[in-house]
UniProtKB/Swiss-Prot annotation:
Family the entry assigns: Belongs to the Bcl-2 family.
Pfam family, one: BALF1
Protein name: Uncharacterized gene E4 protein
Top-level taxon: Viruses
Cystine bridges: none
Signal peptide: none
GO biological process: regulation of apoptotic process
Amino acid sequence: MVPSREFFEEEMDRVLENEAQKLSLTNLLKNVFAQTLDMKPEGVLTTEEALLAWLVDECKKEYLHQLIELVMQVPVSVEAPTTSAINNSLGIIRQTHGQGEDNFGRLLCSLSFASCFLELVLQSDERCLSVFASELAKFYVESQNLWLAYSGGLSAGLRERFPRSWLYFALKQKWLRFIYFFK
C-alpha cells in the first residue's frame, strides 16, 4: 500500500515546522550567549533573549565557582579538541535534563554551564558559538519539545515565571529598538 499524498504533506509540514523551531531557537541561543559573553549580538535583543541573558548572567554570578569546576571536568580529545569538547559538554546537558522533571531551573543551569564552557574552553569563538547553539537547539527541539510545549513555549514560560522581569525587559527592549531606529 502506497502512502497517500496527505500523509506526505503532513509529514513535510511537520519536518518544516521542526526545522523552523530549530532555526528560531538557534538564533535565540546565539544572541543569549553573545550577550552573556560580551560579544555583539545581532541587532537589538528580543524580550526573551534579554531576559534569558540576564537570568543566565545572574546564575553565573551566583554559581560561578561550581560552574568553573564543572567546566574544567569536561574531557577534551587531543585529536579533535573543539568537536569533542562540544559533544562532551552537550552530553552533560543531556544528562542534566535526563534526571527528573524538566523545568526552567534546569534550562538556566544548562545555559549558564554552556555560557561558561563557551567562554573558558572555546574562548568565545564565534564559529564554536554558532555550532554549539545549533546543537543545543537541536537537542531542545527534538528531546525537550514536550516540556517546552507543556510550559507554553519559551516566551510564555518566561513571562509566567518572571512577570516583573519580563515587563522590565519588554519596556527596555522597546526603548532600545526606538533609539536604535533613530541612529
